[in-house]
């Protein structure tokens, strides 16, 4: 943004440098080049699915060819049923196929298309994207109502939580695993997740766009119009996951509620109803805004990984989401809070995976 003060340019440069410094060429089981989450620890020298989608969306702005290859690297290991596995390494024996990750890949592909107008890449990816999109409804919709659940191929809750990307989120504390019909490797948590279905709604919208570009017919399921009302608790004024057994809301207010705003699934009235919670300094408008769970929650832990700290991707979803609904002044204020208050962000410190919400 040209209206930002020059002191914030360093943050933008740091973000680009962070991506470039984590760039790794193809080697061994990594058949295409891409970005690793961190070169500082050996166990992070691999490619993770939802990291790849976000890295590629960012790379699209300055190195779209690298962005394409990073996506191709994950699809090199697409399973026969369409699944994209969690993570891949130079040694394929280390790959994790117990779970997938949240589906943001069509968003990444669309970002690449926005900056390149490369219809050939859309044509290359479309069949694979459709196979992955359909996989969610084939293997992760326990009661076949069009609302999906996170799950695993081995029936473990551990891998199912990994599939959400939010490994130890409070909303999963009481979750149980259910075997899905039709395949031995299809298991779901006993709760439908709002973020997953909001992501799928965006994937659906973009896949329809790609189909239009290619002149083909979109033949996937479409439940996108149902997501907002299904997951919105009118009494609490917030989005929550829902239990499969009785449809009740899992009223653990967390960052998954930002996703319907970012994906533009929420209605304007729903976003307005959320504002009291989002702007409450005891809940989500913390010193560093938009934690992974409301800061006054009894289980909130400032060092609890997905049980308290802010993660920059989720904070971005919240701020971008507010902007999507016209709350530009509020979004600007929260953006500056992030830039000004994260220790070392404007100075020489590295960008961290997550941060505490308070001073």
Where are these regions (language model features)?
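Aromatic-rich carbohydrate-recognition surfaces in CAZymes
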Residues: 45-169, 197, 250, 309-331, ...
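Proline-rich low-complexity regions
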Residues: 103, 127, 218-219, 260, ...
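Short, intrinsically disordered, charge-balanced linker/junction segments flanking boundaries
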Residues: 198, 211-215, 359
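Hydrophobic residues within well-ordered, non-membrane alpha-helices that form the packing/core
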Residues: 19, 59, 109, 204, ...
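Extended glycan-interaction surfaces of carbohydrate-active proteins
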Residues: 3-46, 69-95, 145-192, 225-310, ...
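Extended, well-ordered alpha-helical scaffold segments
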Residues: 7-14, 63-76, 119-137, 203, ...
